[in-house]
Amino acid sequence: MRGPVEIAGGIYGLGSEGVNWYLVEDGGRLTAVDAGLPKFRETLEADLRAIGHAPGDVDAVVLTHSDSDHTGVVPALRDAGARVLIHSADDETLRHPGPKKGEAAPARALPRVAWRWRFWKVMGQMTLAGGAKPPKIEGAETFADGDVLPVPGRPRVVHTPGHTDGHSVLLFEDRSTLFVGDALCTVNFFTGRPGPQLMPGPTNVSTSQARESLAAIEPLEANLLLPGHGEPWHGSPTAAVAQARALL
């Protein structure tokens, strides 16, 4: 696991080699965008202390979606007083986590990736970090496409289904920063291919829907994209989407 890295003014990246989550500081308070894997709880207090904060300074955890590598430290932050927010279409899987459906259902996904050694490396890392035992999170507040959330930084929600039914990206307009979750990644963790691209097909509920959701990302105005997997990408959503489409 890595400690917090300031990516831009008041925006911090945390997590591990393969999984990112973020903190956005605004007016002395924090919004967490996603929440990594359960094992990240072990360093949570130290990570926050490193940027001059404590768990009680996190007002909200805004989740791009309900996958287990994005919800891990939610219980610890909620216990410290944070609200939890997610798109209404992912609330059910947040409350009752289990195997994904569609293309990502194990029976469909495994035959497509089981021969890749990187797949087993990634799955091993995530399992050791608690990804196979995600927390059950009840009572989250739900949002919808177009909502501007009343949390530090006031992100605007753009619904981008495909990776999950409720997947959403979050635009912090005053920071010109787009948190893309798993609508885009900047590295394919099964092949190592770098650059903006869709998540690997076997991880998506519907890759065709994820492809269609690129149209919602393309016109957004930002100069920094922060993914759930891979390095920050400096450039416009339009340029990132063009690169992703070129790989389809």
Where are the model-predicted features located?
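Binuclear metal-ion centers of metallo-dependent hydrolases, dominated by the metallo-beta-lactamase
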Residues: P232-L248
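Active-site HxH/HxHxD metal-binding segment of metal-dependent hydrolases
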Residues: R49-G139
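Residue-level marker for buried hydrophobic side chains located in beta-strands
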Residues: T31-V33, V62, V84, T177-F179, ...
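Metallo-beta-lactamase
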Residues: L37-K39, A129-E138, V148-P150, R154-P161, ...
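Short alpha-helical
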Residues: V19, K39, S68-D69, E92, ...
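Short, structured coil segments at secondary-structure junctions
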Residues: I7, D79-A80, E221
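Conserved beta-strand hairpin/beta-sheet module of binuclear metal-dependent hydrolase folds
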Residues: R2-I51, L170-T186
